[in-house]
């Protein structure tokens, strides 16, 4: 019986197979696992098109297995709305950073499913997961300490809530302070 491969590209060796190379293949599998749970990679995005990320079976090369990594930073100057896809059937957690420049959206999705979209000014990091069909935003729950930073409420970034100083909250609409609340 010949080896088969998991969705992440791990070689699943058959009993009695790979005599003399079993150790090397196991080391490759361990490197693949490492990249899947702790790997970081930067990926240039095709401007106004689709960038398909892939996983190559039994291969630890970064450029041919970007979709395997835990943390993916999307880069490049885009001049049109762009889509980045990961293979269908992969069930995995991703931390995705939109590090692109240009006032266009970037969608991160599975090849044939749905996903999340970074707004035109949303140069942030998102925790998402693939359920094998779609990319789902993991979101967050509970209290969040903004540490005086702005909470951006819309895609173009001009509606915000800020607590710049102690005991005062500012609400900006269309970039101008419209409401202030003080204690």
Regions found by a protein language model. Give the residues of each.
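Short, surface-exposed beta-edge/turn micro-motifs
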Residues: 67-70, 90-93, 124-125, 157-158, ...
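Exposed extracellular interaction/assembly regions and N-terminal maturation sites
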Residues: 1-10, 16-105
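A structural detector for beta-sheet-dominated domains
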Residues: 13, 56, 73-75, 85-87, ...
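Beta-strand-rich solenoidal segments
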Residues: 82, 90-91, 104-141
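Intrinsic low-complexity, repeat-rich intrinsically disordered segments enriched
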Residues: 30, 40-54, 112-115, 134-183
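Extracellular disulfide-bonded cysteine-rich modules/repeats
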Residues: 21-28, 122-132, 168
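Residue-level signal for pocket-adjacent positions within structured domains
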Residues: 5-8, 79, 113, 130, ...
């Amino acid at each position: 019986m010949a080896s088969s491969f998991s969705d992440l590209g791990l070689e699943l060796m058959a009993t009695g197979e790979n005599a003399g190379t079993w150790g090397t293949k196991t080391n490759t599998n361990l490197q693949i696992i490492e990249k899947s749970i702790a790997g970081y990679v930067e990926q240039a995005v095709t401007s106004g098109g689709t960038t398909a990320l892939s996983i190559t079976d039994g291969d630890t090369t970064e450029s041919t297995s970007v979709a395997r990594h835990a943390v993916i930073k999307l880069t490049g100057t885009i001049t049109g709305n762009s889509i980045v896809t990961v293979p269908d059937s992969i069930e995995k957690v991703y931390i995705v950073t939109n590090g692109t420049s240009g006032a266009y959206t970037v969608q991160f999705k599975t090849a044939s499913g749905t996903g999340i979209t970074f707004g035109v000014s949303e140069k942030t990091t998102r925790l998402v997961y693939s359920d094998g069909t779609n990319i789902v935003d993991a979101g967050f729950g509970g209290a969040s300490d903004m540490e005086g930073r702005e909470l951006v409420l819309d895609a173009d970034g001009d509606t915000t809530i800020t607590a710049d100083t102690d005991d005062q909250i500012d609400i900006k609409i269309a970039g101008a302070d419209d409401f202030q609340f003080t204690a």
